[in-house]
């Protein structure tokens, strides 16, 4: 399960939501959504600020170091120079890794970077793709470790009050995998 983190607004819940998920056998990672899914302009300053907030919120939720925290990269305003996107992402990465977490990037619609830029210009080694991300948009060489799936009726869990999505997790082309918080003895990936 991916739990969202605030970028500017206060987190609605704290660690009280963590334990029921873990007890139910659900692994937990964190994602910080961007300010707009349609037209935002990234910068190095925003990356540093948002990354610091993500690391701080992860700590407030009681998530231990070493768990993946994901940067949402989508909705970049068309025409934004790629270097601004790169600076945002690398600053976000530095802040999150400086907090002890494993930074990953969610590549969604209008990410503002080419597959080669995603792989060669960013510090990230963990990539997660939107359900509508085509294979020719995946980070060059490495590929994805997680792929969001289209929601299906069978994915709804009865009597579970949290909205969630299904993602397929696998090793990328270089053997990398995301890390998550789970109870001791949680199944390992094949």
Model-flagged regions — what are they?
Residues 1, 26-32, 67-71, 103-105, ...:
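Hydrophobic faces of well-ordered beta-strands that scaffold small-molecule active sites
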Residues 3-6, 33-35, 74-76, 108-112, ...:
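Active-site beta-loop-alpha junctions enriched in small/polar residues
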Residues 40, 57, 65-70, 111-132:
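Accessory recognition modules or surfaces
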Residues 117-190:
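Functionally critical loop-and-helix segments that line ligand-binding/catalytic clefts
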